[in-house]
Amino acid sequence: MKITLAQITPKLSTDNIQLHLDIINEYKKESDVIVFPELSLHGYLLQDKVYENAYTLDDIQILVDASKEVDIVLGLALKERKAIYNAGLYLSGGKVHHIHRKNHLPNYGMFEEARYFFKGDTTEMFDTSFGESMVVVCEDLWRSSIISRVSENKPKYLYVIANSPARDFSDEGLLIESQWQSILKSTALLSGTTVVFVNRTGFEDGLGFWGGSLVIAPNTEVLQKCHYFKPEVLTIDTSKALFDANRMIMKHG
């Protein structure tokens, strides 16, 4: 399976659909799934503008149509009746195949999501052409209940889309990155799943997003990783990478 990590710097506006289409059109022939970050259609600090900038599913039909040629995971502020959710979509075959509404909305320090979004209350597995999968959004995976849910379901692929700001620098590196890697690797090991993590880059109102998108094998090996702090689009053939990883384990184990 060929997964493309679309580590982008979205604008803080509704002017991001064309960016998605450009990447989709460029990489669709070499990809099975293209994965964008959390709120990739908007940027992160929408705050009061979330009400005017949120999309209905009809508003993004052009992206849904694009999934006739390649599966797509993306993030948006999703308007449903009178509620707005921080949502992750899995698009496939010209349809909205799955919607995950972020369960855990951070509301501490620099984060105020609970002020602007409704929370989701389910985290479900769904079938795709490439195996059973799940989607979670950023803070979701920092909760033991979600990790337990993933571990119980044991999907073949877990897509984790994020808007993680850089913080806690030290001589050893970026603390938030090492914390994320610990969570992602633990989830991969406990659930026996390939974990696909896509974080954004760029700056918004003093927040710098560190990127570092990656794919982790069920044995916790990092199969491929994007650069820090700059946009990058990277495609990985997970079948080959997993084969090589398992061969190295057998050789040295």
Language-model region placement:
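Binuclear metal-dependent phosphoesterase catalytic core
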Residues: 217, 221-247
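Short, acidic/polar
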Residues: 16-26, 143-149
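Cys-nucleophile CN-hydrolase/nitrilase-fold catalytic domain and related Cys-dependent amidase chemistry
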Residues: 11-13, 21-93, 97-99, 164-193
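CN hydrolase (nitrilase-like) catalytic-core segments centered on the catalytic cysteine
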Residues: 57-73, 142-228
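Extreme N-terminal starter segment of soluble prokaryotic enzymes
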Residues: 1-5
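Hydrophobic residues at beta-strand termini and immediately following loops
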Residues: 6, 100, 126, 198, ...
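Active-site catalytic loop in hydrolytic enzyme cores
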Residues: 57, 80-157, 161, 167-168, ...
